[in-house]
């Protein structure tokens, strides 16, 4: 399944070796749910992209990735558009949504693990690994932040892969290292450490059931059908998305 997904970036699976996979999603704290009267919308992304929800949550802190290449595909898919942003008008429409919620956003950050774990923010967009790490840290210190990592329709799926540069001098060692990371014992330990899903199926069998049964780490078949693969945006789409983001 991962190899099929990876073909969007590596046709024929000729070069890339997957070692981790995960989802881009959102998390909310107990305080955030309290401000919403304990009721979450059917579409969890509404929490992030509709002012009727962000207005209620701004007092406890909303955080977005400071990464347009991560945020725009999620928002485009939410709007029913091509996540690649191939149509400039689609990107502009997405930017208007971002403008509408911008006054309610407290922080733009590449990583929000600590802020979310402390309860400094109550709604965050991020990858499932970071969000689940924040949840684990919060539970470890028993600070009662009450983080829930949501699994709404339209999550973005990504794959981290190994590639060997064409001009690499130590190709044999590179292959040895890749094989080492794919060893079930090693891959399982790494997956547990970062709360990502190892690409190796035998590794998954060595991970705690609590993690394997967490859909924001190991999405189920329906999640996969309802989501999309994070795309490689064209140079023009990237440039426009960055320009719109900076505005």
Segments (PLM) and residue ranges:
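A ligand-binding cleft/hinge motif common to bilobed small-molecule-binding domains
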Residues: 123-143
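Mature extracytoplasmic/periplasmic domains
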Residues: 160, 165-225
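A bilobed periplasmic-binding-protein/Venus flytrap-type ligand-binding module shared by bacterial periplasmic
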Residues: 27-32, 76-80, 158-170, 189
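Conserved C-terminal helix/tail region of periplasmic/extracytoplasmic solute-binding proteins
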Residues: 114, 221-247
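Extracytoplasmic ligand-binding site segments that recognize negatively charged/polar headgroups
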Residues: 1-120
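Solvent-exposed loop/turn segments at secondary-structure junctions
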Residues: 24-26, 32-34, 68-71, 128-132, ...
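Periplasmic-binding protein-like
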Residues: 91-99, 142-166
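Non-transmembrane alpha-helical segments in soluble domains
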Residues: 46-49, 72-76, 95-98, 113, ...
């Amino acid at each position: 399944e991962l190899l099929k997904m990876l073909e969007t970036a590596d046709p024929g699976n000729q070069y890339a070796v997957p070692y981790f996979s995960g989802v881009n999603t959102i998390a909310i704290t107990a305080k955030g749910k309290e401000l919403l009267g304990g009721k979450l919308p059917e579409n969890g992304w509404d929490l992030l992209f509709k002012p009727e929800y962000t207005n209620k949550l701004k007092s406890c802190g909303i955080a977005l990735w400071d990464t347009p290449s991560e945020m725009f595909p999620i928002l485009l898919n939410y709007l029913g558009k091509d996540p690649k942003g191939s149509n400039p008008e689609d990107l502009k429409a997405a930017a208007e949504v971002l403008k509408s919620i911008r006054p309610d956003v407290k922080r733009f950050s590449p990583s929000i693990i600590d802020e979310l774990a402390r309860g400094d923010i109550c709604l965050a967009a991020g990858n499932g690994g970071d969000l689940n790490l924040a949840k684990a840290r919060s539970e470890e210190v028993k600070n009662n932040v009450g983080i829930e990592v949501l699994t709404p329709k339209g999550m973005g799926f990504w794959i981290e892969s190994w590639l060997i540069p064409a001009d690499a001098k130590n190709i044999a060692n590179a292959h040895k290292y890749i094989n080492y990371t794919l060893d079930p014992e090693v891959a399982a330990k790494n997956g547990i450490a970062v709360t990502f899903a190892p690409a190796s199926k035998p590794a998954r069998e060595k991970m705690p059931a609590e993690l394997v049964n967490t859909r924001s780490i190991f999405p189920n078949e329906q999640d996969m059908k309802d989501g999309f693969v994070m795309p490689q945006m064209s140079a023009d789409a990237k440039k426009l998305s960055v320009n719109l983001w900076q505005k």
